[in-house]
Design a protein with these regions (language model features):
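Short intrinsically disordered terminal tails
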Residues: 1, 105-106
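Winged helix-turn-helix DNA-binding recognition segment
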Residues: 34, 51-104
């Protein structure tokens, strides 16, 4: 049986973060899928997590996202296509939807 992780002392105990009411979360299983995405898709996915409502939806325009991420609009569209292909995002203009992660099939 796996032991619970031991508590660690923070490096800077005066700056321990707390979760704000508007907290956005990322599924820890994304760690194992980042390599398949590329930097632009990772940036877009992170942005969409920050922008999403409680159902995972957001209405940000590609041009606005591009400006916020310092990307070209075409890069945002290509990143979106990659996220769709990986099953991480659904899109119907102008709505983005973050999808729940499914465990990979063996």
């Amino acid at each position: 049986m796996r032991q619970p992780p031991k508590a660690v002392d923070p490096v800077d105990p005066t700056r321990v973060r707390t979760l704000p009411a508007h907290f956005a979360w990322l599924d820890h299983r994304l760690r194992d899928r980042l390599r398949a995405l590329g930097l632009e898709a990772i940036a877009l996915l992170f942005f969409l997590h920050l922008a999403a409502d409680k159902t995972g939806c957001s209405f940000w325009a590609d041009a606005t996202i591009a400006r916020k991420l310092d990307l070209r609009e075409g890069d945002v569209i290509a990143a979106r296509d990659r996220l769709i292909a990986q099953g991480l995002v659904a899109y119907r203009y102008p709505l983005y939807q973050l999808l729940p992660l499914e465990d990979p099939q063996p």
